[in-house]
Amino acid sequence: MRYVVFLLCILSFHAAAQSPAPPVVKEGNTFKISQHVYVIPDELVPMVPNVGIVVGTKATLVVDPGMGRRNGEAVLREAKKLSRNTEFYIVNTHFHPEHATGEAGFPPEAKVIRAAAQQQDIEEMGMQWVQNFASRSPGIAETLQGITGFRKPAEVFEKEKTLDLGGVRVRLLRLGPGHTRGDTVFFVEQDRVLFSGDLAM
């Protein structure tokens, strides 16, 4: 009997993973995991990343702001609840649309920082991936509506960069190729928290 229950649990989990739930970042669900780091969890919803928010005394860093403008706007609202910072940086673990196109929901003065290899991925394949994702379901197509390109980075780095947010430093490390050519991880030094994206699933 317990084997049947176990099998049913597996089938239920598989069905849930395949369900056409809209890829929406859940507002009001942000929680603190360390002194400077907050996470909006993916809630096991397909096409929703675990969004990271790192808050310093001078600036806020957002990691993987989700898919499309509306999700990006939701992430920005959550980030603004955590501090009075007006300076925002946006980084992505890789260029896939469910991680990177939420940049569109941030104001123009928010600064995007990318590894050169990730920028190359975007220039060569970015919109092709957006179109591919949009063709998968009406919900994803609606989420990506209005995405006609990726934001231009304020800064591009080759292998490594350290970002000082005020009282907390974040190391940006390009580790790809792995999941993609431009895979980048973000290590919050004081908190010893690592954002690895789809390199670790």
Give the location of each predicted region.
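Active-site metal-binding motif and surrounding structural segment of the metallo-beta-lactamase
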Residues: 57-61, 69-114
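Sec/Tat-exported extracytoplasmic proteins
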Residues: 83-87, 107-110, 114-117, 122, ...
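Conserved beta-strand hairpin/beta-sheet module of binuclear metal-dependent hydrolase folds
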Residues: 30-78, 184-198
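Extracytoplasmic
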Residues: 34-35, 48-49, 85, 92, ...
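Metallo-beta-lactamase
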Residues: 20-21, 25-27, 32, 120-175, ...
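Active-site environment of divalent metal-dependent phosphoester hydrolases
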Residues: 48, 70-71, 95-101, 119-122, ...
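Bacterial N-terminal signal peptides
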Residues: 4-14
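Hydrophobic/aromatic beta-strand patches that form the interior of the parallel beta-sheet core
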Residues: 38, 91, 111-113, 155, ...
